[in-house]
């Protein structure tokens, strides 16, 4: 399983985010990336299972929006095919369908997913974050608040040291 983390406001302490995010690296030791959305941070530790090439590395981006996801999207090939006239896919990753789905259907896209997942989407147009998980929480997604009251999402809860 991979690890995802999101900080949903302009971050003035990248080191603190990196320190917390580093505690989850055991879930994704193959590669790591943090992207600054301009309105917060999204982090991804990769355990390469699907989309094994570098193009399958997250966060995925599309038109100023970003997504990080830990999950398995069943039947993603069918979803890719339905979006292929509007979007050229860059990888074999099942999670790459999420942003084109979101751009096309908004949050209604989650009803279309046969999946076990936890994801965080940053919408570059509205400058909002959307966090979601599968209905029964096979892939849990925790949230909390920092000292400033900013919401933080993480796939794996780790207690402060």
Question: Where do the PLM segments sit?
Answer:
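Cysteine-centered catalytic environments shared across enzyme families
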Residues: 1-159
């Amino acid at each position: 399983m991979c690890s995802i983390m999101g900080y949903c406001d302009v971050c003035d302490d990248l080191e603190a985010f990196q320190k917390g995010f580093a505690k989850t690296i055991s879930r994704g030791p193959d590669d790591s990336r943090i992207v600054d959305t301009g309105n917060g941070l999204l982090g991804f530790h990769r355990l390469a299972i699907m989309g094994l090439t570098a193009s399958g590395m997250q966060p995925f981006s599309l038109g100023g929006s970003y997504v990080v996801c830990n999950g398995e999207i069943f039947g993603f090939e069918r979803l890719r095919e339905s979006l292929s006239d509007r979007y050229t896919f860059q990888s074999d990753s099942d999670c790459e369908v999420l942003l084109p789905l979101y751009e096309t259907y908004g949050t209604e896209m989650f009803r279309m997913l046969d999946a076990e997942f936890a994801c965080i989407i940053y919408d570059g147009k509205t400058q909002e974050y959307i966090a979601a998980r599968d209905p029964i929480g096979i892939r849990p997604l925790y949230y909390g608040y920092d000292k400033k009251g900013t919401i933080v999402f993480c796939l794996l809860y780790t207690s402060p040291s």
